[in-house]
Amino acid sequence: MAAKEVKFGREARERLLRGVDILANAVKVTLGPKGRNVVIDKSFGAPRITKDGVSVAKEIELEDKFENMGAQMLREVASKTNDIAGDGTTTATVLGQAIVQEGVKAVAAGMNPMDLKRGIDAAVDEVVANLFKKAKKIQTSAEIAQVGTISANGAAEIGKMIADAMEKVGNEGVITVEEAKTAETELEVVEGMQFDRGYLSPYFVTNAEKMVADLDDPYILIHEKKLSNLQSLLPVLEAVVQSGKPLLIIAEDVEGEALATLVVNKLRGGLKIAAVKAPGFGDRRKAMLEDIAILTSGQVISEDVGIKLENVTLDMLGRAKKVNISKENTTIIDGAGQKSEINARVNQIKVQIEETTSDYDREKLQERLAKLAGGVAVIRVGGATEVEVKEKKDRVDDALNATRAAVEEGIVAGGGTALLRAANALTVKGSNPDQEAGINIVRRALQAPARQIATNAGEEAAIIVGKVLENNADTFGYNTATGEFGDLIALGIVDPVKVVRSALQNAASIASLLITTEAMVAEVPKKDTPVPPMPGGGMGGMGGMDF
């Protein structure tokens, strides 16, 4: 086991604080509409330019082990806030730094760290309650656009695009962000349920120009197993032919004789038909087939539930207004499922999302939820250079997360104003002077985001904060982008409650841990032993070759 170095008390806290300051000072320059960029060196390719706090925080690694511990713990504040709310990472970092700085001073002055922590926790709880009380629910698409614009650092076109996407796919719909191949940023919406399986044979195509199969008002057979011969399928095929409607077969696979027979029937014109593989794998495939069945008011034909292919009747098949099948994707539009059954399934998936601990499972469940509840929108981010596209994509991701958070828990006045007001409204009392000091630490720290936004804009922070606090209206604040004071909600300068409260809760949680640190242990860095010099004298037996 390698030797360890141990630091105690004041020295330990000072080293931690130094690490916190290095990371926070790099991150906080990005805060606000006039925040600056940070350039991050990459070991290959062009450097990355970003205004996203968590991206900067993740890149910082310090040489000194003890300072690095402080930096990594503050990085955790940004990461946690990003995981919960998807935005507000810079605000969280600024709050964390402010609480740690004040807390370390208080401990150095002889106050009890545990009482300070209790005071900090009590103050944070009251501020969060205050934020919920002041929250304004989001109703209109214009309000969603405002939130997106603020989070994208004032880019109105990004805010509007996100609002359009949310309007089209609903609040539950999936909105993904991709890099475009062109200079334009565009929005593409896929309505209905789409899964990534295309037709099994190009002979199923109905539109040879576009190479797609369009089925209008089809029956949909959802089968869990492989189909290799059609003997057992004949009764249902005959019933479909008599009805004059097209048929879509979704099965694990359609092979050999079965596929050949379907293609021959299609080419002879007797049967409008297409077959696709079932989406997903294993248990996820079963769940997705069940989703399709509920969406189309059909049944999954499976021997698990005692239904054999030969006994299938038309009423067991799903229905939809239209099915569009390309080489790679199948889209079911306007399924005939009952609204109540779809809603019950949506609620069931929501419960699974809450309970799952795996990020991958959560992502897949959210995709299923979106396909059932609304649809899928893709925002393709364009730009003149790769560096610009990556920077813009960071901002779109932030804006998207912020708008989702705003829809969930409402909005408050932006620009750090809500926290300023909450600091003024703090009434909680500590049970001893040290707890009071903890409450005052939070009271002062709550001014930090507003001050930093003003500083980044080249303003005098103390004057701006003073003017804002002179007016008692909750939503009165400073619009840094235009340099005017006014009602921030009316001006569209808003922050989602979820982002603001997550930033504060995570900052206080990690900062409290740093303040209550009394000892630190780190490995002693290994000293590199120099490589011994080559023995002189040239090669043996070849005297006289010394150089």
Curated annotation (Swiss-Prot):
Q: Could you say which enzyme class this protein belongs to?
A: isomerase
Q: Where in the cell is it found?
A: Cytoplasm
What's the EC number here? 5.6.1.7
For this chain, the family text in UniProt reads: Belongs to the chaperonin (HSP60) family.
One cellular component term from this protein's GO annotations in UniProt = cytoplasm
Question: Which PANTHER family did the record assign?
Answer: 60 KDA HEAT SHOCK PROTEIN, MITOCHONDRIAL
Task: Give the protein's function.
Answer: Together with its co-chaperonin GroES, plays an essential role in assisting protein folding. The GroEL-GroES system forms a nano-cage that allows encapsulation of the non-native substrate proteins and provides a physical environment optimized to promote and accelerate protein folding.
What keywords are annotated for this sequence in UniProt? ATP-binding, Chaperone, Cytoplasm, Isomerase, Nucleotide-binding, Stress response
SUPFAM superfamilies according to UniProt: GroEL apical domain-like (SSF52029), GroEL equatorial domain-like (SSF48592), GroEL-intermediate domain like (SSF54849)
This protein is called what? Chaperonin GroEL
Q: Which domain of life is it from?
A: Bacteria
Which HAMAP family does the record cross-reference, listed alphabetically?
A: CH60
List, alphabetically, the Pfam families matched.
Cpn60_TCP1 (PF00118)
This chain's source organism reads Bartonella henselae (strain ATCC 49882 / DSM 28221 / CCUG 30454 / Houston 1)
Binding-site residues, ATP: T30, L31, G32, P33, K51, D87, G88, T89, T90, T91, G415, D495
| Assembly behavior | Forms a cylinder of 14 subunits composed of two heptameric rings stacked back-to-back. Interacts with the co-chaperonin GroES.
Instruction: Return one Gene Ontology term, BP aspect.
Output: protein refolding
Q: Which portions of the chain have biased composition (kind: Gly residues)? A: 536-547
**Catalytic reactions on record:** ATP + H2O + a folded polypeptide = ADP + phosphate + an unfolded polypeptide
The principal localisation class reads cytoplasm
